[in-house]
Amino acid sequence: MTSTPKPLVLIILDGFGHSDIPEHNAIFAANKPVYDRLCATQPHGLISGSGMDVGLPDGQMGNSEVGHMNLGAGRVVYQDFTRVTKAIRDGEFFENPVLTGAVDKAVGAGKAVHILGLLSDGGVHSHQDHLVAMAELAAQRGAEKIYLHAFLDGRDTPPRSAQSSIELLDATFAKLGKGRIASLIGRYYAMDRDNRWDRVSAAYNLIVDSAAEYTADTALAGLEAAYARDESDEFVKATRIGEAVKVEDGDAVIFMNFRADRARELSRAFVEPDFTEFARARLPKMAAYIGLTQYSAKIPAPAAFAPSSLNNVLGEYLAKNGKTQLRIAETEKYAHVTFFFSGGREEPFEGEERILIPSPKVATYDLQPEMSAPEVTDRIVEAIEQQRFDVIVVNYANGDMVGHTGVFEAAVKAVEALDTCVGRIVDALDKVGGEALITADHGNVEQMEDECTGQAHTAHTTEPVPFIYVGKRNVKVREGGVLADVAPTMLKLLGLEKPVEMTGTSILVDA
């Protein structure tokens, strides 16, 4: 007879880093009796979630996709950002057959190359250096008409920081002697991931038909006008730059974001023949629509950089060992706790169940800082009490999503809501003899103001993240841990040998 599972719960507090600086630190300011008690009574420490420790360039802040990939893989996963940057440096990028093939088709027919992407040095969804390289590639291969449709950031970068990025691309086009920025729009519209199709349609119509709320002679003038309307980068409304540019039949369209989750909705509008989420005024017969990476196996668009496969990630290895698992999150982070945590796999593993709790329908999450955390917690407590699962993996979105708003008071409320939820999980586990690991994927909410500019700090950080063991074992947290060490730690607690593919090592050692 098999023993009843007493679940091991991995609690991922998204965007919940650690900083010893109390100023503008929502975690420090929050009333969080549960978290404080756990830190005082349970084995705890800090682990790294940024830079080379997660497969990103040195000094690069972590993000949710990267964090969950590393958490689930049990090894450092070298990220698409790093792969693309290396290919540009090595020159391989300029010979990439998917990119060159798309450009050559357009050039051969005397047509245009349209480059879409987040124009930012944030490095979370894209990097401006990649957009520069794409413009250079198009020019090298003879494209005369090169148009950049720039999505502005202000979320993974300071809220009003797009000027330098626009100047970089303007200078690039001037140096090439061809090409220009054709449109501006905030990522709030172009990069939605919560089925707000009215936002996506504004971006689609701007790119395809140059349908804009505002026009400007230059991109910098368009940005200045948006700031005058009190629109920060993320929220810049559809702005046509210069003469109208449309996506015509035979043009090539290349989406230069390397992160998938916020590239899917707009891509679907471009490539799905039976798309019904909004009425497309026109669907051009493009020579090619390319994604820099694979945005989804279900989206029919070639990827310039195909996904690298990861074998024996935590979910797969649990399934092979007959263990049951539950993945749960609200909409904003559901892809992270499923697709990314599973190493880029869409389908559940055998014995894996998933629960999606809808995120609240508010314009920005400072308006509802608790988000759907109470509802997520209801379902977790229920699952713990049922004792059906060996492992439960939950993501709480609040620290990251409310942190991104830059509203300090709301961020404090988000942390306090999380504290209540964690307390409910710990109490439920105590009743059944379960255990938990509490950690985060990257920092955010611990720094809510930019100390240099005084602006709201809406981006992620490079701070370490907490790691707390909740249970009865006599263990301690070793130093030097990284996100890739979390899965091997879980396997050790479950009494399973880690697979050879997992190069991480347990963060917990005997006390």
Curated annotation (Swiss-Prot):
Binding site for Mn(2+) 1: 400, 404, 460
GO CC annotation: cytosol
Cofactor note: Binds 2 manganese ions per subunit.
UniProt-annotated catalytic positions: 64 (phosphoserine intermediate)
Keyword Repeat applies: no
Gene Ontology molecular functions: manganese ion binding; phosphoglycerate mutase activity
SUPFAM superfamilies from the UniProt entry: 2,3-Bisphosphoglycerate-independent phosphoglycerate mutase, substrate-binding domain (SSF64158), Alkaline phosphatase-like (SSF53649)
Cofactors demanded by this protein: Mn(2+)
Residues holding substrate: 125, 155-156, 187, 193, 259-262, 333
Assembly and binders: Monomer.
Family: Belongs to the BPG-independent phosphoglycerate mutase family.
Protein name: 2,3-bisphosphoglycerate-independent phosphoglycerate mutase
Upper classification of the organism: Bacteria, Pseudomonadati, Pseudomonadota, Gammaproteobacteria, Pseudomonadales
Gene: gpmI
